Structures are given as C-alpha cells and as structure tokens.
Amino acid sequence: QWQVDQTAFALASRYYWAKVNRLAEHPEAIAQPGPDAAERTDTRQFEEAPAAGRRMVVMTSDLFRAQQTAHAFADILGLPVTCDQRLRERSFGEWEGMTRAEIKAVAADDYASWKQHTGGETKHGVESRAAVGQRGADAVRALVIDSAYSDSTPTTLMLVTHGSWITATISNLLELDPDGMNALGGMRNACWCRLKVRHSVNGTPTEQPLWELEEYNKAPAIADSADWENGPTDLRGPHMPSWQPIVW
C-alpha cells in the first residue's frame, strides 16, 4: 500500500488540473460556508480556469488490487473510477497463484521455456504474451476512438492495470515482439508509463493511431531514496514478508 500511495500522491500532484475540471463540471461538490456567511465560494473560479476545458478519465481492471490502486489516485482528486474487464492481468492458467519455485518443481522444462520466451507456459493454459498484448492493444485503441472521449476536448486516459498487461500491450502498440528477448523490461510495482497518441503526420491523417512512449516504468522520486519494494522501516511489522528479487 505504501508504494501505491506514494505513486498516487505524485500523480495527483502532476494531474491536479483534473480536480479543477471535476469541480467545474460539478460545482455542487465545492465546499461552501454556512448560510450566514458573508461570502460564498465563487464557482466561476473553477469554471473559467483553462483546466475546465480538459478531461481526465480513470479506468481500471476489475481485479481488486488494481481497483485499490485506482482509487488511491482518483479519490484524492474526486474522480470517478470505471472498471473494465479488458484491462485484466495476463491469465496464468494452471500456474495462477503459484510461486516460481513451485512452477519449476512441477514443470521444469516449461518453466525454462517461459523464461526463454519460447511459449512452454501455454501448455498449462497460460495466456501467451502475444495474446495479452493484442487484447490490451485492442482495448486501448477502442478507448481512444470511443465517441465518449474522441471529441475535441483534450482527454487524458488513466488506465490502472497490471505489469504483464502493460508490458505486452505497449509492445503491441509499438509493434515490438512481446516474445523477443530484446524487449521492454518488466514493470516494478506501482510504477507508471505514459503514451502519447497522434492521429496525423504533418497534417495528414493516419489510418491508425500512432504511439509515442514518453515514460516507462517510472516511479516517484522517493523510490530512489527509500526501500521502494519493502517500504520504510517504521512501517514494517514483524509479520510482513520481505520482497525478494526475482531470479530468472
């Protein structure tokens, strides 16, 4: 939770304009003094701000841990959160919930194939990297052209999802081989990426949206000065497990 909250604070600061936009659209949510007060908050302060002309949409996987993360961010800014099954994590089939040691113990050859990106995990019902990347990219492309968000209002889509989904989806959008060993690295917990979408080149419309990866696997500044994986010592109790590096 510590990681999630630190990321939420950092991104809420970056996207504070979204709170102003929300209050401009819903002035009834602006706190007002009692009826006997000499003055009341002028809602035009929000309605006339440039931020009122923008839009932030927060969507999350319907899995619980993603919803927690989404609300940690959105609740600070007073934004609604919409669940979308298309943002669900990669399915790990028979291996769901197992540790790497447990998988290796029962399927050593297929575990090795998984490490080498040669697909042995799919024998156990695990969704392939290509499949999850296609599923995710289809969802992102559909959201970008959704009539609810594709009008002239500048819109930021905040998609809260899972590490394997993120890496595979971005790989697909950038036309990278998700099974290639020269690829995007795995996501750290509670980190973010930022994509910019373009619909034209030099004024000429493109058939499909074009994507620019502006940030990948980014964390708040505190991640560089604290134990990001385990949290500060004053937050750790004797029954909290310690994070262990993943050894492939």
Regions from the PLM with identified roles:
Residues 1-79:
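Active-site-proximal alpha-helix that buttresses catalytic centers in soluble enzyme cores
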Residues 59, 82-84, 214:
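General small-molecule cofactor/ligand-binding pocket signal
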Residues 60-61, 134, 160-161:
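Short beta-strand scaffold positions
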